């Protein structure tokens, strides 16, 4: 028998070493996903809260109506400068956090590379673009008021009030909720009711956007749907947090 045969026989006779990862390593394997779930749920709760503050505070501060004279707008913007700047921040930040929540849902569902994921991503980009433009117009009002520029004050204020409510349901909102709804279908990321209601919200936004073209009632419906959207995001975020906590509890019991 040659030396190579002896070596191979010894190798075959030796037991096979099985490397088992320590429990700590196994426990940390799902940490990135759990962390993403927690951060996503947090963003999904804080975002709608900021948007609720953005929509509520102006009503309590006697916000000017459409058609207010430039002189009155300048006086109001000068006295409530922080309200305009804070409103722009609340709107942009609240929308950004809501979009972060949508992106987390897409990541968890594994649908980013699908058609539904692409539709949702495009809708998120459109939504953030519209929001940032409106926030910029809103913050331009006190800046122009400080310079005594009546034309810019009147134009910026008019564009930042009511225009967003008409544009939002035309494309951004339906694309976001249609994409998210179909992306969540057949997954266990959230309970099935959220996928179904997301598609329903998409349809209602389309109806509101079309109705707003012909009557004020459509604009009112679009505003109501914006509230429904915020409620859906907050409820979905809470559901995500609960499923994350439940999964972590089961993982702890298995260890």
Functional labels for PLM-detected ranges:
Residues 2-255:
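Hydrophobic, aromatic-enriched alpha-helical segments typical of multi-pass transmembrane helices
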């Amino acid at each position: 028998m040659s030396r190579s045969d002896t070596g191979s026989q010894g190798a075959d006779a030796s037991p096979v070493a099985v490397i088992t990862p320590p429990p700590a390593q196994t426990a940390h394997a799902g940490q990135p996903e759990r962390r993403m779930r927690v951060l996503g749920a947090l963003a999904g709760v804080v975002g709608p809260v900021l948007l609720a503050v953005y929509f509520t505070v102006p009503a309590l501060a006697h916000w000017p109506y459409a058609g207010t004279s430039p002189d009155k707008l300048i006086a109001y913007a000068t006295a409530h400068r922080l309200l305009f700047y804070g409103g722009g921040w609340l709107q942009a930040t609240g929308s950004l956090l809501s979009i972060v929540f949508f992106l987390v849902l897409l990541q968890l569902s594994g649908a980013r590379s699908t058609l539904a994921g692409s539709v949702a991503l495009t809708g998120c980009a459109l939504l953030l673009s519209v929001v940032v433009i409106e926030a910029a117009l809103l913050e331009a009002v006190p800046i122009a008021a400080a310079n005594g520029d009546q034309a810019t004050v009147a134009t910026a204020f008019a564009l930042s009030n009511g225009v967003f409510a008409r544009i939002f349901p035309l494309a951004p909102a339906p694309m976001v909720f249609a994409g998210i709804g179909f992306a969540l279908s057949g997954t266990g990321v959230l309970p099935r009711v959220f996928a179904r209601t997301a598609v329903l919200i998409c349809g209602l936004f389309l109806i509101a956007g079309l109705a707003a073209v012909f009557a004020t009632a459509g604009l009112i419906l679009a505003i109501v749907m914006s509230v429904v959207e915020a409620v859906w995001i907050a409820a979905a975020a809470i559901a995500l947090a609960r499923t994350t906590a439940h999964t972590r509890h089961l993982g702890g019991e298995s260890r």
